[in-house]
Amino acid sequence: MELIVYIIVLAFFFELMDSSAGMGFGTGLTPLLLLMGYEPLQVVPILLISEAVTGFTAGIFHHEFENVDFSFSKKMSTEMRITLMITAFGCFAIFFSVILTYFALKIPTDMVKTYVAILVLAMGLIAILRFKKTSSVYRPKLLFGFAALAGFNKGIGGGGYGPVVMLGQLLSGIYEKSATAIVSLAEGMVSILGFASFLLISTYGVSIDYVLLPSIFTGGFIAAIISPYMVRVVPNNFWKICIPIYALCIGVFTLSNVYL
Protein backbone atom coordinates (compact mmCIF):
# COMPACT_ATOMS: atom_id res chain seq x y z
CA MET A 1 0.00 0.00 0.00
CA GLU A 2 1.31 3.44 -0.94
CA LEU A 3 0.36 7.05 -0.29
CA ILE A 4 -1.57 8.66 -3.16
CA VAL A 5 -1.16 12.43 -3.03
CA TYR A 6 -4.44 13.48 -4.65
CA ILE A 7 -6.38 11.09 -2.37
CA ILE A 8 -4.66 12.65 0.67
CA VAL A 9 -5.68 16.14 -0.52
CA LEU A 10 -9.30 15.09 -1.13
CA ALA A 11 -9.50 13.33 2.25
CA PHE A 12 -8.04 16.40 3.98
CA PHE A 13 -10.54 18.77 2.35
CA PHE A 14 -13.64 16.68 2.99
CA GLU A 15 -12.63 15.82 6.57
CA LEU A 16 -11.89 19.50 7.24
CA MET A 17 -15.45 20.32 6.19
CA ASP A 18 -16.84 17.27 7.98
CA SER A 19 -15.30 18.08 11.36
CA SER A 20 -16.07 21.80 10.95
CA ALA A 21 -19.62 21.62 9.58
CA GLY A 22 -20.60 18.13 10.70
CA MET A 23 -20.89 16.58 7.25
CA GLY A 24 -19.20 15.90 3.92
CA PHE A 25 -16.46 13.29 4.41
CA GLY A 26 -18.25 10.14 3.31
CA THR A 27 -21.06 11.87 1.44
CA GLY A 28 -18.65 13.96 -0.66
CA LEU A 29 -15.66 11.64 -0.94
CA THR A 30 -17.46 8.38 -1.77
CA PRO A 31 -18.97 9.54 -5.12
CA LEU A 32 -15.61 10.99 -6.22
CA LEU A 33 -13.73 7.79 -5.45
CA LEU A 34 -16.34 5.70 -7.25
CA LEU A 35 -16.06 8.00 -10.28
CA MET A 36 -12.29 7.44 -10.22
CA GLY A 37 -12.93 3.74 -10.72
CA TYR A 38 -12.63 2.41 -7.19
CA GLU A 39 -15.12 -0.25 -6.07
CA PRO A 40 -17.51 0.21 -3.09
CA LEU A 41 -15.63 -2.42 -1.08
CA GLN A 42 -12.41 -0.47 -1.65
CA VAL A 43 -14.07 2.71 -0.39
CA VAL A 44 -16.79 2.18 2.24
CA PRO A 45 -14.89 0.02 4.78
CA ILE A 46 -11.84 2.29 4.53
CA LEU A 47 -13.91 5.40 5.13
CA LEU A 48 -15.34 3.72 8.22
CA ILE A 49 -11.86 2.94 9.60
CA SER A 50 -10.74 6.52 8.96
CA GLU A 51 -13.92 8.04 10.42
CA ALA A 52 -13.53 5.92 13.56
CA VAL A 53 -10.15 7.52 14.28
CA THR A 54 -10.85 11.04 13.00
CA GLY A 55 -14.21 11.15 14.79
CA PHE A 56 -12.62 10.43 18.15
CA THR A 57 -9.74 12.81 17.39
CA ALA A 58 -12.05 15.67 16.41
CA GLY A 59 -14.27 14.96 19.43
CA ILE A 60 -11.32 15.23 21.82
CA PHE A 61 -10.16 18.52 20.30
CA HIS A 62 -13.70 19.93 20.23
CA HIS A 63 -13.83 19.26 23.98
CA GLU A 64 -10.40 20.82 24.53
CA PHE A 65 -11.38 23.96 22.59
CA GLU A 66 -14.63 24.14 24.63
CA ASN A 67 -16.94 23.80 21.64
CA VAL A 68 -18.73 21.14 23.69
CA ASP A 69 -18.65 19.49 27.12
CA PHE A 70 -18.06 15.74 26.94
CA SER A 71 -17.19 15.41 30.63
CA PHE A 72 -18.15 12.48 32.87
CA SER A 73 -17.12 14.17 36.13
CA LYS A 74 -19.79 13.89 38.87
CA LYS A 75 -22.68 14.04 36.40
CA MET A 76 -22.66 13.17 32.70
CA SER A 77 -23.07 16.29 30.57
CA THR A 78 -26.16 16.78 28.39
CA GLU A 79 -23.97 16.72 25.27
CA MET A 80 -22.47 13.37 26.28
CA ARG A 81 -25.91 11.87 26.89
CA ILE A 82 -27.05 13.05 23.45
CA THR A 83 -23.91 11.58 21.87
CA LEU A 84 -24.43 8.18 23.48
CA MET A 85 -28.09 8.12 22.48
CA ILE A 86 -27.28 9.00 18.86
CA THR A 87 -24.51 6.39 18.87
CA ALA A 88 -26.75 3.61 20.22
CA PHE A 89 -29.41 4.07 17.54
CA GLY A 90 -26.77 4.59 14.84
CA CYS A 91 -24.89 1.40 15.75
CA PHE A 92 -27.99 -0.74 15.45
CA ALA A 93 -28.87 0.81 12.08
CA ILE A 94 -25.38 0.61 10.56
CA PHE A 95 -25.01 -3.08 11.43
CA PHE A 96 -28.38 -3.81 9.84
CA SER A 97 -27.61 -1.80 6.69
CA VAL A 98 -24.16 -3.35 6.07
CA ILE A 99 -25.58 -6.88 6.30
CA LEU A 100 -28.58 -5.96 4.16
CA THR A 101 -26.70 -4.08 1.44
CA TYR A 102 -23.49 -6.06 0.96
CA PHE A 103 -24.52 -9.56 2.03
CA ALA A 104 -28.27 -10.09 1.69
CA LEU A 105 -30.05 -7.85 -0.83
CA LYS A 106 -27.14 -6.00 -2.49
CA ILE A 107 -29.09 -2.76 -3.05
CA PRO A 108 -28.00 -0.81 -6.21
CA THR A 109 -25.53 1.98 -5.39
CA ASP A 110 -27.32 4.60 -7.53
CA MET A 111 -30.58 3.99 -5.69
CA VAL A 112 -28.88 4.56 -2.35
CA LYS A 113 -27.10 7.72 -3.53
CA THR A 114 -30.34 9.19 -4.89
CA TYR A 115 -32.17 8.53 -1.64
CA VAL A 116 -29.41 10.10 0.48
CA ALA A 117 -29.12 13.15 -1.81
CA ILE A 118 -32.86 13.89 -1.78
CA LEU A 119 -32.97 13.46 1.99
CA VAL A 120 -30.04 15.85 2.51
CA LEU A 121 -31.52 18.44 0.12
CA ALA A 122 -34.84 18.37 1.97
CA MET A 123 -33.22 18.73 5.38
CA GLY A 124 -30.94 21.52 4.15
CA LEU A 125 -33.94 23.49 2.87
CA ILE A 126 -35.75 23.02 6.18
CA ALA A 127 -32.67 24.21 8.09
CA ILE A 128 -32.39 27.34 5.91
CA LEU A 129 -36.07 28.16 6.50
CA ARG A 130 -35.40 27.71 10.21
CA PHE A 131 -32.48 30.21 10.12
CA LYS A 132 -34.68 33.28 10.75
CA LYS A 133 -35.86 31.89 14.08
CA THR A 134 -34.09 33.56 16.97
CA SER A 135 -34.48 30.50 19.20
CA SER A 136 -35.38 26.84 18.89
CA VAL A 137 -37.28 24.54 21.20
CA TYR A 138 -35.11 21.69 22.46
CA ARG A 139 -36.77 18.46 21.23
CA PRO A 140 -34.37 15.55 21.85
CA LYS A 141 -36.96 12.88 20.94
CA LEU A 142 -36.62 13.94 17.28
CA LEU A 143 -33.04 12.66 17.36
CA PHE A 144 -34.01 8.98 17.71
CA GLY A 145 -35.29 8.75 14.15
CA PHE A 146 -32.51 10.92 12.70
CA ALA A 147 -29.83 8.80 14.42
CA ALA A 148 -31.23 5.51 13.10
CA LEU A 149 -31.67 6.92 9.59
CA ALA A 150 -28.12 8.28 9.58
CA GLY A 151 -26.64 4.96 10.71
CA PHE A 152 -28.50 3.17 7.93
CA ASN A 153 -27.08 5.64 5.38
CA LYS A 154 -23.54 5.21 6.72
CA GLY A 155 -23.53 1.45 6.36
CA ILE A 156 -24.90 1.54 2.83
CA GLY A 157 -22.53 4.01 1.20
CA GLY A 158 -20.03 5.29 3.76
CA GLY A 159 -21.76 8.70 3.75
CA GLY A 160 -25.05 10.36 4.55
CA TYR A 161 -24.48 10.13 8.31
CA GLY A 162 -23.21 13.62 9.09
CA PRO A 163 -25.83 15.59 7.11
CA VAL A 164 -28.75 13.73 8.70
CA VAL A 165 -27.49 13.82 12.29
CA MET A 166 -26.18 17.38 12.00
CA LEU A 167 -29.33 18.84 10.48
CA GLY A 168 -31.43 16.64 12.76
CA GLN A 169 -29.72 18.20 15.77
CA LEU A 170 -30.30 21.72 14.46
CA LEU A 171 -33.98 20.95 13.92
CA SER A 172 -34.08 19.50 17.45
CA GLY A 173 -32.84 22.79 18.91
CA ILE A 174 -29.20 21.91 19.64
CA TYR A 175 -26.57 24.69 19.50
CA GLU A 176 -24.62 24.65 16.21
CA LYS A 177 -21.09 24.34 17.62
CA SER A 178 -22.14 21.64 20.08
CA ALA A 179 -23.95 19.77 17.29
CA THR A 180 -20.78 19.73 15.16
CA ALA A 181 -18.75 18.23 18.00
CA ILE A 182 -21.45 15.70 18.88
CA VAL A 183 -21.74 14.39 15.33
CA SER A 184 -17.93 13.97 15.10
CA LEU A 185 -17.70 11.82 18.23
CA ALA A 186 -20.90 9.87 17.52
CA GLU A 187 -19.79 9.15 13.96
CA GLY A 188 -16.46 7.86 15.25
CA MET A 189 -18.18 5.37 17.55
CA VAL A 190 -20.75 4.28 14.96
CA SER A 191 -17.99 3.78 12.37
CA ILE A 192 -16.24 1.27 14.64
CA LEU A 193 -19.27 -1.01 14.59
CA GLY A 194 -19.72 -0.38 10.88
CA PHE A 195 -16.21 -1.62 10.12
CA ALA A 196 -16.68 -4.55 12.50
CA SER A 197 -19.76 -5.48 10.46
CA PHE A 198 -17.63 -5.57 7.31
CA LEU A 199 -15.09 -7.78 9.09
CA LEU A 200 -17.96 -10.11 9.98
CA ILE A 201 -19.23 -10.48 6.42
CA SER A 202 -15.63 -10.85 5.16
CA THR A 203 -15.54 -14.19 6.98
CA TYR A 204 -18.32 -15.29 4.61
CA GLY A 205 -16.38 -14.48 1.45
CA VAL A 206 -16.89 -10.70 1.01
CA SER A 207 -13.46 -9.26 0.10
CA ILE A 208 -12.22 -5.92 1.52
CA ASP A 209 -9.43 -4.00 -0.28
CA TYR A 210 -7.24 -1.75 1.93
CA VAL A 211 -5.33 0.03 -0.87
CA LEU A 212 -6.79 3.47 -0.04
CA LEU A 213 -6.33 3.25 3.75
CA PRO A 214 -2.94 5.03 4.15
CA SER A 215 -3.92 7.98 1.93
CA ILE A 216 -7.43 8.54 3.30
CA PHE A 217 -6.29 8.14 6.90
CA THR A 218 -3.36 10.58 6.49
CA GLY A 219 -5.44 13.41 5.01
CA GLY A 220 -8.37 12.84 7.35
CA PHE A 221 -6.32 12.70 10.55
CA ILE A 222 -4.53 16.00 9.87
CA ALA A 223 -7.85 17.74 9.13
CA ALA A 224 -9.48 16.32 12.28
CA ILE A 225 -6.89 18.12 14.41
CA ILE A 226 -7.28 21.50 12.66
CA SER A 227 -11.06 21.76 12.21
CA PRO A 228 -12.15 22.00 15.90
CA TYR A 229 -10.10 25.19 16.19
CA MET A 230 -11.99 26.63 13.20
CA VAL A 231 -15.28 25.90 14.95
CA ARG A 232 -13.96 27.60 18.08
CA VAL A 233 -12.90 30.88 16.44
CA VAL A 234 -15.57 31.31 13.75
CA PRO A 235 -18.83 32.99 14.97
CA ASN A 236 -21.81 30.68 15.48
CA ASN A 237 -24.04 32.64 13.06
CA PHE A 238 -21.65 31.68 10.26
CA TRP A 239 -22.16 27.97 10.95
CA LYS A 240 -25.92 28.48 11.29
CA ILE A 241 -26.19 29.47 7.61
CA CYS A 242 -23.06 27.71 6.27
CA ILE A 243 -24.09 24.23 7.41
CA PRO A 244 -27.46 24.02 5.60
CA ILE A 245 -26.05 25.67 2.44
CA TYR A 246 -23.18 23.18 2.45
CA ALA A 247 -25.75 20.39 2.87
CA LEU A 248 -27.59 21.61 -0.23
CA CYS A 249 -24.31 21.59 -2.17
CA ILE A 250 -23.58 18.03 -1.00
CA GLY A 251 -27.06 16.93 -2.11
CA VAL A 252 -26.77 18.55 -5.55
CA PHE A 253 -23.24 17.19 -5.99
CA THR A 254 -24.37 13.65 -5.16
CA LEU A 255 -27.34 13.78 -7.55
CA SER A 256 -25.20 15.19 -10.37
CA ASN A 257 -22.70 12.35 -9.97
CA VAL A 258 -25.49 9.80 -10.30
CA TYR A 259 -27.41 11.23 -13.25
CA LEU A 260 -24.99 13.40 -15.26
Question: Whereabouts are the PLM-identified features?
Answer:
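Juxtamembrane transmembrane-helix boundary motif
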Residues: M1-S19, G28-Q42, G59-G155, L170, ...
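Transmembrane helix-bundle signature of multi-pass membrane transporters/permeases
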Residues: F12-E15, V44-A52, T180-V190, A247
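Transmembrane helix boundary and interhelical junction motifs in multipass membrane proteins
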Residues: A21-L29, G157-M166
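Helix N-cap / loop-to-helix initiation motif
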Residues: Y38-P40, I174-A179
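Small-residue-rich midsections of specific transmembrane alpha-helices
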Residues: S50-I60
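Residue-level signal for conserved functional micro-sites within the alpha-helical transmembrane segments
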Residues: T54, G194, G220
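Alpha-helical transmembrane segments of helical membrane proteins, especially in multi-pass transport
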Residues: G188-I201
